[in-house]
A protein has these predicted regions:
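12-transmembrane solute porter fold
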Residues: 13-29, 34-36, 55, 67-68, ...
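Structural signature of transmembrane alpha-helices in multi-pass secondary transporters
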Residues: 27, 55-58, 62, 89, ...
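Extracellular/periplasmic helix-loop-helix junction of adjacent transmembrane segments
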Residues: 37-63
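MFS 12-TM fold signature
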Residues: 62, 86-96, 112, 177-181, ...
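Hydrophobic transmembrane-helix bundles of small-molecule transporters
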Residues: 163-268, 274, 279
Length: 468
């Protein structure tokens, strides 16, 4: 049967598709649920002074898990790394569920970050190697939906579990999902073969990943020290410690928006960071500035998640209809719509709630278009033996950039308040920073060459080609 007439849930792909969706849902639910239960964790474990490290440790460990495993996959395939990543993530869940003090909890978050970063990189690789180009838009749309659904339900469900029983059951509850995911995914993962290539040495890449982690950690610590002089000094040192390894770990030209793969990664990292950070500050603006309840704020944010889910499904059908010829324009359109949505959020302190909901719906449509399509385009430009590295780059763009941008946004609020500005004014400045990022993302999206987006031979299922 031709791939044009197959579904991601046809017998050939059913087990792998369900396994991928469950893996993404488990990681997404765990990450978003911790946001809700973190105050309870810190209170019960007498660790309020270490509250921020519940999140920072996860991010820093995720950097290592994401970047290191990509090169391992390109040498050995994704089956073994996926197995070890699952075990690390499960160990982190068990350690968190049984943690007796805050230091054990922080250690468990490190294990979870390592496992989650490696797992998602393996999932992206499986998508590249298993699905033909004609189905990648659909599976990446399902991937996005599997992550968005926890954002709609995860915080509420986690809060309910914590209120009725204990926050520890949130971690225990994810384990069965991971077991089912492993049973469905691993047989398909073991069949995947990669063409071994040369490239950067694993040892060098590992050291660069560690340097990036240390630089990012110092940068995040420095942000919490602002506006003191030490905060600026450490922040500058941390920034240098981030930029130097980034130049080695990412495709050459990513930081300067070079045409092709570098522009794809820059576009994706910037628009996803702007979206994720805006959502965080939107909730703060709605509750503390507009005075609505947390549940009402959650519904407004959920409107973006809902439109994301819908358009992520629809874009897969569009991709099949035009055989991928409209991918470039869909990315540009998606980022442009996201810019409109963020611009509306910029005026949240003064616009009506109905307008805020409309802005969220528009932003959801934008991210629902740009996110899955940028992944499809990235894989279409990946040469044989490079699926693992491309997967690591995509996962890196989805996790590292938002984490850093959220930290910068938080420091903007701190500096503005230290300067005597109101919370409302500080939020406007932070949203302005997000608008700047999305404008740069629009510029980068125009540098994704339409000629490079079509595969040279779309009938070669699952084998991407290098486009010169």
């Amino acid at each position: 049967m031709s791939s044009n007439h197959q579904s991601i849930f046809s017998p050939r792909y059913f087990a792998l598709s369900i396994g991928i969706i469950l893996s993404v849902m488990a990681v997404g639910f765990e990450g978003l649920s911790v946001t809700t239960i973190a105050p309870s964790i810190a209170g019960d474990l007498n660790g309020l002074s270490l509250f921020g490290w519940i999140f920072s440790t996860y991010l820093l460990a995720q950097i290592i898990g994401t970047l290191v495993v990509g090169r391992i996959i390109d040498k050995r395939g994704p089956a073994a790394p996926f197995t070890y990543a699952l075990l690390l993530f499960i160990a982190g869940l068990v350690a968190a569920a049984t943690a007796g003090d805050m230091y054990i909890m922080i250690g468990s978050r490190a294990l979870q970050g390592l496992g989650a970063g490696a797992m998602m990189t393996c999932v992206y690789t499986a998508i590249s190697l298993s699905y033909p180009d004609e189905l990648r838009a659909k599976i990446l749309g399902a991937f996005g939906t599997a992550y968005v659904l926890p954002s709609m339900l995860g915080p509420y469900v986690a809060g309910l579990i914590a209120d009725q029983w204990s926050w520890r059951f949130v971690f225990w509850g994810i384990l069965p999902v991971l077991v089912v995911s492993a049973v469905l995914s691993l047989p398909a993962f073991r069949k995947l073969k990669v063409q071994q290539t040369g490239g950067a040495s694993g040892s060098s890449s590992t050291w660069m990943a560690l340097l990036l982690t240390m630089g990012t950690g110092l940068f995040l610590i420095a942000l919490s020290m602002l506006p003191s002089m030490m905060g600026f000094v450490f922040g500058l040192i941390g920034l240098v410690g981030m930029i130097l390894p980034l130049r080695q770990l990412l495709p050459k030209g990513t930081l300067t928006l070079r045409r092709g793969m570098p522009a794809i990664l820059a576009t994706r990292g910037l628009f996803f960071a702007a979206y994720a950070s805006t959502q965080n500050f939107l909730v703060l603006a709605l509750i503390d500035v507009r005075g609505i309840t947390p549940s009402q704020a959650g519904l407004i944010v959920a409107s973006a998640a809902l439109s994301w889910c819908i358009i992520a499904y629809v874009q897969g059908r569009w991709d099949a209809a035009d055989q991928g010829r409209g991918r470039h324009m869909r990315i540009i359109l998606g980022v442009f719509l996201l810019a409109i949505g963020i611009a509306i959020v910029f005026w949240i302190p003064v616009v009506s709630i109905a307008v805020a909901v409309m802005g969220q719906i528009i932003a959801g449509v934008g991210i629902g278009l740009a996110h899955p399509v940028s992944g499809v385009v990235a894989f279409s430009q990946t040469g044989e033996g490079g699926a693992g590295q491309t997967s690591a780059n995509l996962q890196f763009a989805d996790s590292f950039t938002p984490g850093v941008v959220i930290g910068i946004g938080g420091s903007i609020l701190v500096v503005c308040q230290a300067a005597g500005m109101s919370l409302q004014s500080g939020l406007i400045v932070a949203m302005g920073f997000h608008l700047l990022l999305i404008v740069i993302s629009i510029i980068a999206s125009t540098r994704i060459s339409p000629q490079s987006i079509k595969n040279a031979d779309p009938k070669k299922e699952g084998v991407p080609v290098i486009v010169q």
